[in-house]
């Protein structure tokens, strides 16, 4: 994995080009790739962000607006109030941008997901250039990331993970520079970026830490280096995130986290780490870029006998090898035990593989250009024509992103914004509840209580019973229990790949009871209708808002702020000392 051609010079050149231009041509190419990545993501998913999880993320953004500028601890919009302890960075960023721009949460959610996802090609470019010192390789990898169908697949749901993945190459770059220079500033950047990855997506962070800690351990053992980095990085992250984890620990206790880790994540057959029906074979068939990368790797073996792995193993090579091995092993784990949610974590392997693919393509280009056969000078660049294959796959994707929302649903959302403040609404569980709450700001009975630590809340199941039970007395018992004021029923056929929950017709017919229910509003469209029922009994929602310990919260923020300032002062002192010497 050495340097090729004149690319060794690229790392030491200044921002200005050799011809006197203000911006080097590779940055112009990179910017064009970034713009194309933005375009292809909107083009591939015209329904963005009306999918499953994004509606939930927008509800969390509403909660973040309520607690701004603090990171929210409570989400009042689901389950009569719940703790807010899951993937906070993306919705908080949406709320922050809404505060300073005044734009809607839906628009900001769409653009933040696309921009952070497209920015992955930028962070991959800089990591690749750090790894190989080869501008061509870095640009090819950036392009492959821009058109990778595996990366585009994330837009169906996983916006927080998209953000976390974009931080990972930057964190890896800073870690490489820290190992090379042992400068505290790079270590601090690793800690800050790692903390952001944790806040963005816990599960992404878990795999990320697995990769970097194994790589550091292998490097320390191989070079007989001090293992202090293995301890420093986690300790610095824990200190920086005190504002976030301390209130959670105070509420639930350490044992709850142990139970969650062993009982809900690692061991059960159905969990956040349970494999979907995606296998390594399906990954290969889905990603043409992967097939090209593997094929070109074989070609590189034939072109060059003295392979890069026979060279001196430095930390960048160790890190990239561990990244490939761990992510590939997790994909292949489906053959032995379902430990990974593959449709999310294919991205780890995809990123590492496409970084290597960029280098292999640049290597083959150099070797072909060096061949003394009759042809034009830059014959090696014909290899770049292979990039048309993943480009075609991205532009002509056969993946359908199922969306939410018929015209009558949208009209109902607008009407529901006029409901009395604090009204409690029942909607069909899952995506319907997410989006009616996200767009109208109403409080919904239900949500995803499975993500709450220490809660045994049945609002989601009870919402389903209220809507679908044919027994009106059973409906009313639950309605009185929670103090429900309204019931929204989207009643459509499954047309045009629009998400719609199947409803029990007998359960819907049971609402034709004028003693308990009245139609408050009704909208229809060519596919069906959306009706809002008012509960005739004047009930008060049985809110039991979760309590925030402001003393513990203030302590957590104080520790995090003092820690960050202390790290900053230590870095400044070290830098000043280095300049003085």
Give residue spans per PLM region.
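Extracytoplasmic
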Residues: 5-8, 63, 119-122, 131, ...
């Amino acid at each position: 994995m050495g340097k090729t051609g004149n690319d060794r010079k690229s790392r030491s050149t200044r921002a200005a080009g050799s011809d006197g231009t203000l911006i080097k041509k590779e940055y112009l190419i990179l910017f064009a790739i970034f713009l194309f990545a933005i375009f292809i993501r909107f083009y591939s998913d015209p329904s963005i962000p009306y999918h499953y999880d994004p509606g939930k993320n927008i509800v969390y953004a509403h909660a973040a607006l309520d607690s701004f500028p603090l990171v929210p601890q409570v989400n009042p919009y689901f389950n009569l109030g719940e703790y807010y302890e899951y993937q906070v960075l993306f919705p908080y960023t949406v709320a922050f941008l809404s505060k300073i721009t005044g734009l809607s949460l839906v628009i900001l959610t769409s653009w933040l997901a696309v921009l952070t996802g497209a920015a992955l090609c930028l962070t991959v470019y800089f990591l690749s250039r750090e790894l190989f010192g080869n501008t061509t390789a870095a640009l090819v990898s950036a392009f492959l990331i821009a058109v990778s169908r595996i990366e585009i697949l994330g837009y169906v749901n996983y916006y927080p993970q998209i953000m976390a993945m974009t931080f990972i190459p930057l964190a890896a770059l800073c870690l490489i520079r820290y190992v090379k220079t042992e400068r505290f500033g790079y270590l601090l950047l690793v800690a800050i970026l790692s903390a952001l990855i944790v806040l963005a997506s816990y599960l992404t962070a878990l795999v990320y830490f697995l990769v970097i800690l194994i790589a550091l351990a292998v490097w320390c053992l191989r070079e007989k280096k001090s293992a202090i980095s293995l301890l420093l990085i986690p300790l610095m992250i824990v200190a920086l995130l005190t504002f976030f984890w301390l209130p959670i620990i105070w509420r639930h206790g350490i044992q709850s986290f142990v139970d969650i880790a062993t009982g809900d994540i690692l061991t059960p057959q159905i969990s956040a780490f349970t494999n979907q029906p995606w296998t390594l074979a399906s990954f290969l068939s889905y990603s043409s870029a992967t097939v090209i990368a593997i094929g070109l790797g074989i070609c590189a073996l034939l072109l060059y006998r003295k392979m890069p792995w026979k060279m001196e193993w430095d930390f960048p090579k160790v890190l990239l090898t561990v990244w490939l091995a761990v992510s590939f092993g997790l994909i292949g784990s489906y053959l032995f035990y379902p430990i990974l949610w593959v449709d999310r974590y294919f991205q780890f392997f995809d990123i590492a593989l496409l970084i290597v693919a960029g280098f292999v393509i640049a290597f083959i280009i150099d070797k072909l250009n060096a061949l003394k056969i009759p042809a034009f000078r830059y014959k090696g660049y014909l290899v770049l024509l292979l990039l048309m294959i993943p480009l075609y796959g991205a532009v002509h994707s056969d993946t359908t992103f199922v969306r939410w929302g018929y015209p009558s649903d949208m009209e109902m959302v607008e009407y529901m914004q006029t409901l009395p403040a604090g009204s409690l609404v029942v909607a069909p569980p899952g995506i319907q509840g997410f989006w009616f709450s996200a767009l109208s700001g109403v409080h919904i009975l239900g949500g995803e209580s499975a993500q709450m630590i220490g809660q045994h809340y049945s609002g989601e199941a009870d919402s389903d019973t209220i809507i679908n039970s044919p027994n009106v007395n059973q409906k009313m018992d639950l309605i009185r229990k929670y103090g429900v004021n309204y019931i929204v029923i989207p009643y459509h056929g499954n047309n045009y790949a629009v998400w719609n929950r199947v409803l029990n017709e007998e359960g819907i017919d049971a609402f034709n009871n004028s003693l308990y229910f009245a139609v408050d509003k009704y909208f229809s469209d060519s596919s069906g209708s959306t009706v809002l029922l008012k509960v005739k009994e004047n009930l008060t929602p049985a809110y039991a808002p979760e309590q925030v310990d402001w003393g513990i919260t203030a302590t957590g923020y104080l520790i995090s702020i003092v820690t960050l300032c202390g790290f900053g002062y230590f870095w400044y002192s070290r830098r000043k000392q280095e300049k003085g010497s």
